[in-house]
C-alpha cells in the first residue's frame, strides 16, 4: 500500500534521511523506534508530504510524492497524521475541529460531516465534549480529538508522531487504547513511539532507526528479544535500565 524507495532528505549539507526503502502492507501496524535525532519524525513528515523529498519515491496506491503534478490534498486524504502536540484549532469547538477538513477539502455537506464527527467522537469516547473548546480538555482528550479529526478524512493509513510523549503518564493509556482499537480494525499505521509495550503488543513490525537509516527491522519479538545490530542492542539496554 505504501512503497518507499531510496528516500533521501537533507537540509543544506545536513543529511537527515539516507536512502530509506520500505514497503508497508495494507492493514499493517508498524512502530518506529530509535534515539532522538535519528530522523524518525522527518521520515513521517516526508510520507505525509509535509517535507519535500530530496530524492527517491514515496508511493501510496497510485500517488507518487515525487510527481510534480501531484494533487497534495488528494494525497493527504489517503494518509492522515496525528502530531505530538495535537495541533487543534483553539478558536473552534471539538466538533468544528473534526468537520473542518471534510467540509472544506472533500466538499462533504455540513450535515453529513456533523453526523460523521459525532460518530467518531463516540468512537474515541468524547461525544459529550463535542461543543467545548480545546482549552477545556486534558492532554489525553485533545489527542483523542486529534485522532478523530484525522479519521474524519477516511484515510487509508494513519501516521502517529510520538502521540503520547506530551501527555502526563496517567493519560497515556486512554490514547493507546484508541490506537489499539484502530490496529484491531485493520487500519494501516506507522507509529513513531517510545511506548515499547504498545510496540510489542500491537504492532506487526518494529523498525529501529539511527542516524537517518533503518538499522534493523523485524517482528516485535525478534527486535526486542534478539536484536542483531549492535546499535539496536545498545539502545534497548539503555531503555530497559530506566
What are these regions (language model features)?
Residues 210, 217, 221-242:
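C-terminal boundary and immediately downstream tail of ABC-type ATPase nucleotide-binding domains
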Amino acid at each position: 500500500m505504501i512503497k518507499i524507495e531510496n528516500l533521501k532528505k537533507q537540509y543544506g549539507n545536513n543529511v537527515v534521511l539516507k536512502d530509506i526503502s520500505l514497503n508497508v502492507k495494507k492493514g499493517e501496524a508498524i512502530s518506529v523506534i530509535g534515539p532522538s535525532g535519528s530522523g524518525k519524525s522527518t521520515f513521517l513528515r516526508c510520507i505525509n508530504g509535509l517535507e519535500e523529498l530530496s530524492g527517491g519515491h514515496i508511493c501510496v496506491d497510485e500517488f507518487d510524492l515525487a510527481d510534480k503534478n501531484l494533487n497534495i490534498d488528494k494525497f493527504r486524504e489517503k494518509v492522515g497524521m496525528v502530531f505530538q502536540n495535537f495541533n487543534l484549532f483553539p478558536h473552534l469547538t471539538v466538533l468544528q475541529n473534526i468537520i473542518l477538513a471534510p467540509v472544506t477539502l472533500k466538499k462533504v455537506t455540513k450535515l453529513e460531516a456533523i453526523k460523521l464527527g459525532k460518530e467518531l467522537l463516540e468512537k474515541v469516547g468524547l461525544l459529550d465534549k463535542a461543543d467545548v473548546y480545546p482549552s477545556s480538555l486534558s492532554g489525553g482528550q485533545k489527542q483523542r480529538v486529534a485522532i478523530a479529526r484525522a479519521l474524519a478524512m477516511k484515510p487509508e493509513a494513519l501516521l502517529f508522531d510520538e502521540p503520547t510523549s506530551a501527555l502526563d503518564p496517567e493519560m497515556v493509556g486512554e490514547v493507546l487504547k484508541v490506537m489499539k482499537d484502530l490496529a484491531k480494525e485493520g487500519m494501516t499505521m506507522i507509529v513513531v513511539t517510545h511506548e515499547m509495550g504498545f510496540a510489542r503488543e500491537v504492532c506487526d513490525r518494529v523498525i529501529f532507526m539511527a542516524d537517518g537509516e533503518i538499522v534493523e527491522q523485524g517482528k516485535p519479538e525478534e527486535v526486542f528479544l534478539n536484536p542483531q545490530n549492535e546499535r539496536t542492542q545498545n539502545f534497548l539496554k539503555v531503555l530497559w535500565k530506566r
